Design a protein with these regions (language model features):
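Sec-dependent bacterial lipoprotein signal peptides
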Residues: 1-15
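Bacterial Sec signal peptide processing site at the extreme N-terminus
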Residues: 15-29
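Surface-exposed acidic loop/strand-edge motifs in secreted or periplasmic proteins
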Residues: 36-117
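Gly/Pro-enriched, hydrophobic low-complexity segments
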Residues: 92-179
Length: 179
């Protein structure tokens, strides 16, 4: 009987759902998933080393378009102690601590009066033996909806080349309704 009780106890413990992973920082990944869930039509401007191309897009895959914004999610176990919190009322701001070597250098979200993101800005950079890369990502929102975003940056071979510079700018035209 005792064995049965112990077995039943372990079975109940094993069936309880595991807790959500701890979030030490603003849950940007969750916010980005929410923003990506609504279809969006954008006018996109791409500038590559001074050459400009304008693309009117009927509807874009926001998950792919904003893949670089996913890099700014700080809620990874290895990042937990690597950032200094410089937040203030209405501003969420994290800066990489001195001596740390992680790609996200700065993470800032300005909130509107309802506590929703209004301006989002991230600085990401990395270097290895071959490349040096830097990116600045920004997004503007009104009432929780994206009105524009910009991804700009450069990449270069460390020793032998001038950097390739790029900018991708998207301006929301209107929300696309799904049928």
């Amino acid at each position: 009987m005792i064995r049965l009780s112990i077995l039943l106890l372990f079975t109940l413990i094993a069936c309880t759902p595991s807790p959500e992973p701890a979030t030490h920082f603003y849950d940007w990944k969750k916010e980005l998933n929410r923003l990506s869930s609504s279809p969006l039509s954008v006018k996109k401007t791409v500038i590559l080393d001074g050459t400009t191309e304008i693309i009117d897009s009927v509807q874009i895959d926001l998950t792919k378009e904003w893949a670089l914004f996913q890099e700014a999610d700080l809620n990874k176990p290895a990042y937990a102690l690597s950032y200094e919190d410089r937040s203030a009322p209405g501003i969420i701001h994290y800066v990489l601590k001195k001596g740390e070597d992680l790609p996200v250098r700065s993470f800032q979200i300005d909130l509107d009066s309802a506590g929703r993101p209004a301006v989002v800005e991230f600085v990401i950079s990395s270097e290895n033996l071959i490349y040096t890369t830097s990116k600045k990502l920004s997004m503007r929102l009104i009432s929780g909806r994206v009105v524009s975003y910009t991804i700009s940056g450069s990449q270069a071979l460390r020793w032998f080349s001038t950097p390739t510079r790029y900018t991708v700018r998207g301006e929301a035209l209107r929300a696309v309704t799904s049928r």
